[in-house]
Each structure stands twice: as structure tokens, then as C-alpha cells.
From Swiss-Prot:
It comes from the Eukaryota. This is DALR anticodon-binding domain-containing protein 3. GO terms for biological process: arginyl-tRNA aminoacylation; tRNA C3-cytosine methylation. Pfam families: DALR_1 (PF05746). Part of a complex containing tRNA(Arg) and METTL2. Interacts with tRNA(Arg)(CCU) and tRNA(Arg)(UCU). Interacts with METTL2. Involved in tRNA methylation. Facilitates the recognition and targeting of tRNA(Arg)(CCU) and tRNA(Arg)(UCU) substrates for N(3)-methylcytidine modification by METTL2. InterPro entries: DALR_anticod-bd (IPR008909), DALRD3 (IPR037380), tRNAsynth_Ia_anticodon-bd (IPR009080). One of its GO terms (molecular function) is ATP binding.
Amino acid sequence: MATGRLGVGETLEALNAAVGPGSPVWFKETHARHLRVRDFLAPRSALQARFRDGQVPECVFRAVSCLQGPGVAPVLRCAPTPAGLSLQLQRPAVFEHVLGALASYATPAKPASPGPRVVLHCPALRCNSGTLRLSQLRAVLVADHLVRVLRAHGVRVCSVPPVRDPHMSTFLQKLRVEWPTASKSTSTETLRTCVLANLNGSKEATLPPGVLGRLCLKELVEQRGTAGYDPSIDHCLVTEDVLSVLSELQEAVRHWPEGGHPGPAGRPDAGVDDCVVIHVVSCEEAFQQQKLDLLWQKLDDRAPHKQKHLVCGPVKMAGVPGTQLTAPQYYRLRHAQVCEASALKHGGDLAQDPAWTETFDILSVATIKFEMLSTAPQSQLLLAHSTISTKGTKSGTFVMYNCARLATLFEGYKHGTEQGLYPTFPLVSSLDFSLLHDEGEWLLLFNSVLPFLDLLSQTVSLAGTPGLHIPVRTEMVCKFLVQLSMDFSSYYNRVHILGEPRPHLFGQMFARLQLLRAVREVFHTGLAMLGLPPLSHI
């Protein structure tokens, strides 16, 4: 019997506990072909390893069949099959449970107490926007995505550095990247004093112009030998720019903005023990950032001990010999391709139509973000130049298109209601979800709506992971939205949702609309994690 919000993780945990001690044997099915006959499977090979001759004891069958507990989905049947132990859920009951509480499946719950504090540092934002490399753009988009996901889960995030270049600020607005701005630099006097004290009068006469001194970091690297710092790090040349970077980080940690957002300063020296610093850097910046991390620890005994690095892999564009495109050039290329593709589809020059300007801007950003974020951030990314990524089922445009189809569907229902074709939407508690028996409907609920928040929480883990690098899976949301779009598109093309205005058909129509309400909410939450607003038309 299910209690509370249903969860795939909770159900799997209960299933494995029912089998007894040992490694997990159950997994959730995802393929449509398998979901026609089962929802979970314990493979025969795993059962043979667990039980003598693969014979499952009768007590295990009974325990699985009577499975219940917080978050555990209700079981219909459990039976041995050639593939293994097959389990099917009470699908109408699962539909009713999930679709009767949409918000708890589409919106992350805020914790009762304040979450941890995170300083999220993206060095690429100190660059000039006109020279921003594609690998740096990738780091910026990954950082923005992380900020949104962390805040959605109640984590207090302070984004560093505040952007001072107005051209960079304008470019970020085009990309729908939310980042704080500032007009003044922080003071570096205290850090400069620390540097001079560490030099102990041993200032070198041969230092390059603008360098205050050379500080040895070798001892720190050796002390943290297993942490993951590059063993070749020896020393760091300290400049005013380096001190400015450290001063910004120091300010973010000690003078925490209220609510984790830029704004009035919170209480000074808010404590560093509960603070995690995440440096999101391009692969070209990784070595220098390790030096700055160590230098901060050397100069400031109150620097956070928990500093993690996320190194984004290189980005290359195929078909562009010689010099790589800058980030603004890449944006203009994708924007032009979006406008061209839309002109071919709709005819005429819609790019000059003010009503379409914002739509094209959003589609361009969606194209870029899905290209940049659909690959694991640590991996190399190869972008196509001439082959436009706005086409096909794996593009951001495809996701935005299907989100717009949902908007059109509900607008159609609204107009039908106003014209008297359909009755107003009944209470959800009165809907008959046993009328949802199409395999596409279960696919949408079981693969998308039900596991969505669990997937979102797996994007980044702030748990005490050893080592310098933080496990981050920023590709998960993009891949999820693409798969959801494919499943929804297949269902929508095959099933007529708004049927004939006949009373005996309304029950199934309303059950389907409630399911698609859930799909719409999941779409909107997922897109919000990418900084993308849903479109009502394309």
C-alpha cells in the first residue's frame, strides 16, 4: 500500500529488501516493449547468483506481492518469467496517486531548514565577452544550470564573480543566464599585506612587471597529496589580478548575501565550515584555478576547506579550419540558422516580424543550451557548423516545439469550453484513471512524471565526496527533456486528445488532459532549470 509521494527509488529499495541481504537485483524497466508486460524485473542471472538453482523462496514471493511502505508503489502481481522475476504495478492506482498531487511530482520541495551554502565560482565571467571562447561559454552555461538546480533544492548559492563588463552583462541576458553584476572592485589591501608577509623580504629582483611576488605552493600540494591537485604545481606568481580574484571569493564567503542571492550583505564572517566552493572552469583554466585555490588557503586561514573543481571538457566546432569561433560569433551563427529554418517552414522573412523576435531569440538560446549541456560536462564536445542542430529529435528546438504543442492543446480545450463544446474541468478526485490504458500514457507517467524529481536531485551531489573534483551530471535534464519530447510527440501524433463533444467520451478526455497537465508541469520545471521560458507557439 502506498503512502506519501511515490518514488522509484523507494520502490526499488523495498523490492531489494524483500529479496533479502545482498547486492540489488531489481531494476526499473524503461523500454516501451518491456513495459507492455512488466514495470520492474529481477533478472534470472541475478536470482541464480542469489538463490540456489535460481529458485526464489515462497516467502520472497509473498513479501514482494504484499510490498508496502512510504513511497512504495502498489503492486498488482509478481510472477516468474523466462527473463526473471517480473513485477507489474497497480497502474490505475499509480495514475490516481501521482496525477492527484501534481505539484509534489513536478516541483522540488523546499527543505524545512536552510540548506548548505555554496559559492559557485565561474572565472570565465571575468573575460571580455567579445573574446569568450566556446569552452568558456560551456563553463558559463554549466554554472548557470547548477545555480538554478541547487536553488530549486533549497541550497543557498552565491554566484562569483559579479559581472562588471556591461557588454558581458548584455551577452548573458541574450543567453538568459542570470548572474549578479557590480560596478566596484573589492579591496585587496589585506591580501596584499599577507603576500608581503609571506615573502619575508625575499622579493626577487627578476620578477616580471606587475608581479608582487612568487609564493611556493609545493608544500601545500604535498600535504594534500591524495586530494587530486596537479603534482607539478610548484609556485604561483602573485599579481593584482590574482589578489582581486581571491578578494571576490573571500567577500562572498564572509559577507553572505541574504537568501543566497546578490543583495544587501548578510552577517559578516557567516562561518566557513558549512560553505562549499565550487569552481566551474574550462579545461584551459583548470591548472591556474588549482593554483588560486591553494594560494587562497595559504594566505587566508579562514578559507573554506571544502573546495571542489568542475572542469569542463574542450569544445571544438567541426568544419571551421584555423581560428575557432568566439561565443558571440557562435550565438549569431545559431540565431541566423534558426531564422533561416523558420523561414523555410513558414515562408517569408519572419525574422523581421516583431511578433516573432522573442521566439527566435528563445529558440536560438535553446539550441545553444541543448548543444552545450546534453553532453557530460567533463567530456569533449564537438559542435556542427554547417549541419544545423535545430533539426532532429535531439535538439532544443524539438523540445520547445513539443512544449508549444501542449500549450496549443490546452488553449484548444479552453476555446472549446468557451464555445460550450466541453464542460469545465471536473475535480481531479472524480476522474477515472482506469480509462488510461494506452501504452503511451503509462510511458509518459512511469518514465517521465514519476521519476522526474529524483532525476533532478541527481544532477549534483554536495555530499562529502572525496577528492578535488565534484560529481556533476548536468546533461541529465537535457537528455530527459529530449526523451520526454519524443515520447509525448509519439503519443500526441497517435492519440486524439480533444475528442468529439460527446458525454460518454469526456471521462477519458479529462483523464488524458490531467496526465498532460502533469507532462506540461514537468516540461516547465525542466526548462526553468535551463533558464528557458516555455513557448505558446512556434
